[in-house]
Amino acid sequence: MRRIGVIALQGDVSEHISAIEAAGGQAVPVRRAGIIPTCSGIVIPGGESTTISRQLERTGIAAEIKQAAANGTPVLATCAGLVLAAKEIDAGDVKPLGLIDISVGRNAFGPQRESFEAEINVEGFDRPYRAVFIRAPVVLRCGEGVEKLARFGGRTVAVRQGNVIGLAFHPELTGDLRFHKMLLEA
């Protein structure tokens, strides 16, 4: 059974833990340094990217995530996690981890009250995926080697570069475990 570290500083932590376990993995909450090196995969959940960014730096977890990703550990970054995983962010106080060579725009689909669900086609999936967008970011630019996995309204909302998958939406809120299974099978 693969052990997946779910960054548990703020955001959709319990939902990701439930999804990992439902997909057949062992989920462990990561609140301090020293846990990431014991994991075979990482989830960076949604939440508030500025808050999570500060806590990642303060706890030393940011350096461990960067090292693990550089060593090939699979990473699933969702919503605010996508913002954190980016190389560049359009605005704000977020210190990006630089795991994916992308530029990201925060809250690109509007405020919380304009949250929505939509069917999207994802590269490699045999049927549409019901995506939940909550104050979702968008990928503005993709660098060399970044694969666009899905678009919505002409905008890129899912990407992969090597062992890192970034999603603008919340797969942990859908009951559709395909992205969590991708992480476990990577």
UniProtKB/Swiss-Prot annotation:
Q: Which organism is it from?
A: Methanothrix thermoacetophila (strain DSM 6194 / JCM 14653 / NBRC 101360 / PT) (Methanosaeta thermophila)
CDD domains per record: GATase1_PB
Molecular function, one GO term? pyridoxal 5'-phosphate synthase (glutamine hydrolysing) activity
Under what name is this protein listed? Pyridoxal 5'-phosphate synthase subunit PdxT
Q: Which residues does L-glutamine bind?
A: 47-49, 106, 134-135
Pathway(s)? Cofactor biosynthesis; pyridoxal 5'-phosphate biosynthesis
Which keywords does UniProt give here?
Glutamine amidotransferase, Hydrolase, Lyase, Pyridoxal phosphate
Give the CC-aspect GO terms.
cytosol; glutaminase complex
User: GO:BP terms for this protein?
Assistant: glutamine catabolic process; pyridoxal phosphate biosynthetic process; pyridoxine metabolic process
Q: What is its EC number?
A: 4.3.3.6, 3.5.1.2
Please give the catalytic activity noted in the UniProt record.
Answer: aldehydo-D-ribose 5-phosphate + D-glyceraldehyde 3-phosphate + L-glutamine = pyridoxal 5'-phosphate + L-glutamate + phosphate + 3 H2O + H(+); L-glutamine + H2O = L-glutamate + NH4(+)
